[in-house]
From Swiss-Prot:
The modification O-(pantetheine 4'-phosphoryl)serine is found at S36. Carrier of the growing fatty acid chain in fatty acid biosynthesis. One of its GO terms (cellular component) is membrane. This is Acyl carrier protein. Its main location: cytoplasm. One of its GO terms (molecular function) is acyl binding. It is found in: Cytoplasm. The gene is acpP. The keyword Phosphoprotein applies. The keyword Lipid biosynthesis applies. 4'-phosphopantetheine is transferred from CoA to a specific serine of apo-ACP by AcpS. This modification is essential for activity because fatty acids are bound in thioester linkage to the sulfhydryl of the prosthetic group. It comes from Leptospira interrogans serogroup Icterohaemorrhagiae serovar Lai (strain 56601).
Length: 77
């Protein structure tokens, strides 16, 4: 599994939410209050941190924190 703590810290930094709110089930828009600009910035930060590329199509499918870790795991396997 992708380093959940690393993903979590990026989300906390990018969205300005409390660490306790960032769970695998947390939905970026509904639970963490992200808007479209937030999600673009989050994708860019994740790409930089993990050395990956996330297409716009894939980014649209990523709805929760758990989706991020699964996506990164699939790319790295």
């Amino acid at each position: 599994m992708a380093d959940f703590e690393k993903v979590k810290s990026i989300i906390v930094e990018q969205l300005g939410v409390d660490e306790s709110e960032v769970t695998p089930e947390a939905h970026f828009i509904d639970d963490l209050g992200a808007d479209s600009l937030d999600t673009v910035e989050l994708v860019m930060a994740l790409e930089e941190e993990f050395g990956i590329e996330i297409s716009d199509e894939d980014a649209e499918k990523i709805q929760t924190v758990g989706d991020v870790t699964k996506f990164i795991d699939n790319l790295k396997s």
